[in-house]
Amino acid sequence: SPAYRQAWIALALILPISGFVMYYLWGRSSRNKKKLDQHILRQISYGNQFLIHDEQAYQKFLQENPVAGRMVKYMETAEFPLSAANDVKYYPMGEDAFEDIFAALEQAEDYILIDFFIVAEGALWDKTFEILKRKVAQGVEVKFLYDDFGAAIRTGKYFSTMLQKAGIDVRVFNPIHKYTGELYMNFRSHQKIVVVDGKVAFTGGFNLADEYANLIERFGVWKDTGVRVSGEAVWGLTIVFLQMWEASSTDPEHVGYLRYRVMPESTGDTYCHVISDGPANNPFNPIESIYNQMIMYSDEYLYITTPYLVIEDYMKQSLIEAAQRGVDVRIITPSIPDKKLVKILTYYNYGSLLKEGIRIYEYTPGFVHAKQILTEDAAIVGTINMDYRSYYLHYENGIWMSGEQIQEDIRKDFCATFEESHEVSYEEWKNRPRRYKFIEPVLNLFSILL
């Protein structure tokens, strides 16, 4: 992206030596990075051949939902097939999700697939590990995938070895090497997926760390959201997991995808697209386009929750145009941030949106880490932040859903969160502290790098 290049050029001009070092470490597209992209694309291409395209569900949805059908057509071309008759449960808090995740793990009889960005030692991990060890002893296959950067700081040096000794099949995505040229703080797997026996799967914004279930307090109440799915959408999440599993190894032998295929028994009423994306796809980034389409096709209301609001001008304009055509546009961000500089930049971005009638709320109980978007036609819940890093630099996943009950459940949570949040006015924004006004233009110059 031109903005990405311009940010690095500006940094190099302001900080000639350290700016170049930072670009060398994190900004460049090196030979090793290109090899990694090619390897990942091969695994994605291989896994895509196992996707199930339900032509009957596709045609039925197009007839019933002509507006949302435009998005469905796009997602079909992007290799995110539509599935019908899924049963979906929404979790308004991370602790609610983990309660059901543990229950599902306890019931596992065949296999467990787990993928998290952040893994941290603590009470949540201890309980997870205890269940996994017991399941391995019962003959259940357990595959555990995690991102090296996300887990490096909060797990022990021999974390991977500990899992292997327990009989868990473990892989690490994009290991951080001691060699400077291979240290990638970008290009991480930000995905979160749990699949049990091919019958039930979970995803959302939560990681495997105590704060995500409010077992410890870091930034007040930690609000995260997620979903549990049963039905054909489980197979979609299984494929995403297996694609990244194979991308995390140089083993030329593929896993047997069909070994994990279970015919769905769900009779739910929710249409789903399992969506995923990452830097190997650059410059074709379907998730960014799907988010923009959600904004553009909204007609009645558009509700968004994101911990970081760092978006490019074209998406700001899409939000403004939605408000101008009468859509009720509301955005929830944290009151207590986890990244102070990003918070200042997020607050700076309020201005042009508030001026055009978009309503912005800050979650006063603490930090909102949830990533979701809702319109009258559909919803997305997953790992995707509204920032450049999620759209271009990380591997992400989510579920696009269209169904009366799941949309109503998500809408109720939005409305409840509005009630316990502070609505920021345009006048309040204009009267923000002078120190913010001084630093904002500088931060905005490097917004894509934050």
Regions found by a protein language model. Name each.
Residues 118-123, 304-312:
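Short, glycine-rich nucleotide/cofactor-binding loops
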Residues 314-316, 343-345, 374, 392:
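Histidine/acidic-residue-rich catalytic or RNA/ligand-binding cores of hydrolases
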